[in-house]
Structures are given as structure tokens and as C-alpha cells.
């Protein structure tokens, strides 16, 4: 992983680049732009704007806003599903584009490794780290094979994030799967009647 910082008008954006490169051009196979600002020597995570595409092949891929993660991925090796640049090919048709679909999946997997390594090494130094934990893929896609791919991707990222200490408590961060929360009905009832809290505590 190579870390780059690029200056914007009011903060620094962090980019992670794969050490694996494209043979012909020497470019990184994948670049991940993290939703992390460097402000006054502090790393602060933030939510990307809902209108920012998450996938790029030099230019943004249309319709990839809210793709499923709070990161931006770029690869010169990505292959679009159509010439219209509106989606990546993650499912082949059993003919000539299966190789493209598998390559796109492997690039996303490489990005996953890069992001996971960065989070593992740096999470304790990132404020508002919960913004790194967004996982919300479109699981109700009309293409069943694509929906299954997104389900497996979602399951993989959720399982990984459950093992990271994203949950902030007054005693420090705890691993996500260790967090316990009130049932919504119980929570609402406790807001209305504070005496109910004695049964909980």
C-alpha cells in the first residue's frame, strides 16, 4: 500500500494505491480514496456526499453513487458493463465477458485488502471512524447473479467490520459485535418512562 495525500481547498484527502501495477502503464491496479480528512494533524472520517460516484475508470461511472461502501475506487483495469459507463461488469454471460467480470471482482478484492489493512493499522487514530463502516449494497437487483455477488460482498464486509472496534464508548472503542443496544420499543418506552430504566440497569 502506498499512501498519498492530495491537498484540497480546506483539507487533505488520503489515497491508498496498490503496489501491484498495470504491466503496460505502471499505474497502480487500484486506487482507493478514503473518506478521511486531515484537519489540524487529526484524521477525521466523514460520509461522502450522496452524489459522489464510488467507482471510477479515470472518469466517474454513472449510477455508482451510493454503490455500497463509503470509499471511492479507481482502476484503469475496470471494465464497464456497457459502453455507456453506467456500471461495472461483475457477472459474465458465460461467453466472452466472463474474464472481464472476474477481473473486476479481483480488483474489488484487492481494494478490500488495502482498505482492511489501512483500517487495522490506523483505526485508533481516526476520529468519527463509524463513517468507514458503511456497507449497503443493492441486494434486490433484478439480475439474480449480480444480487448474489452483492450479497456475498456485503456479508464479507459486514463480517470484517464486526471485528473492528468502531463503536465508541466512554471507556474507549469496542469491537462492533460486542455492542449491545436497546430494542427500539424498549428504548422508546424508556424515553417516555425513566422508571423502566431501573429494570435494565
Regions found by a protein language model. Give the residues of each.
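GHKL/Bergerat-fold ATPase module
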Residues: 1-201
Amino acid at each position: 500500500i502506498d499512501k498519498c495525500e492530495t491537498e484540497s481547498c480546506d483539507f487533505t484527502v488520503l489515497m491508498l494505491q496498490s503496489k501491484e501495477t498495470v504491466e503496460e502503464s505502471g499505474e497502480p491496479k487500484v486506487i482507493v480514496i478514503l473518506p478521511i480528512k486531515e484537519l489540524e494533524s487529526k484524521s477525521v472520517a466523514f460520509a461522502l456526499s450522496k452524489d459522489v460516484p464510488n467507482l471510477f475508470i479515470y472518469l466517474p461511472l454513472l449510477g455508482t453513487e451510493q454503490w455500497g461502501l463509503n470509499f471511492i475506487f479507481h482502476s484503469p483495469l475496470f471494465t464497464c458493463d456497457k459502453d455507456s459507463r453506467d456500471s461495472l461488469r461483475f457477472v459474465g454471460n458465460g461467453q466472452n465477458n466472463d474474464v472481464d467480470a472476474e477481473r473486476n471482482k479481483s480488483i474489488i478484492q484487492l481494494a478490500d485488502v488495502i482498505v482492511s489493512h489501512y483500517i487495522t493499522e490506523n483505526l485508533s487514530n481516526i476520529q468519527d471512524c463509524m463513517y468507514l463502516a458503511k456497507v449497503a449494497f443493492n441486494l434486490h437487483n433484478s439480475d439474480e447473479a449480480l444480487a448474489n455477488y452483492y450479497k456475498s460482498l456485503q456479508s464479507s464486509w459486514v463480517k470484517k467490520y464486526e471485528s473492528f472496534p468502531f463503536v465508541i464508548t466512554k471507556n474507549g472503542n469496542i469491537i462492533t459485535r460486542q455492542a449491545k443496544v436497546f430494542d427500539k420499543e424498549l428504548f422508546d418506552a424508556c424515553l417516555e418512562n425513566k422508571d423502566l430504566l431501573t429494570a435494565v440497569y
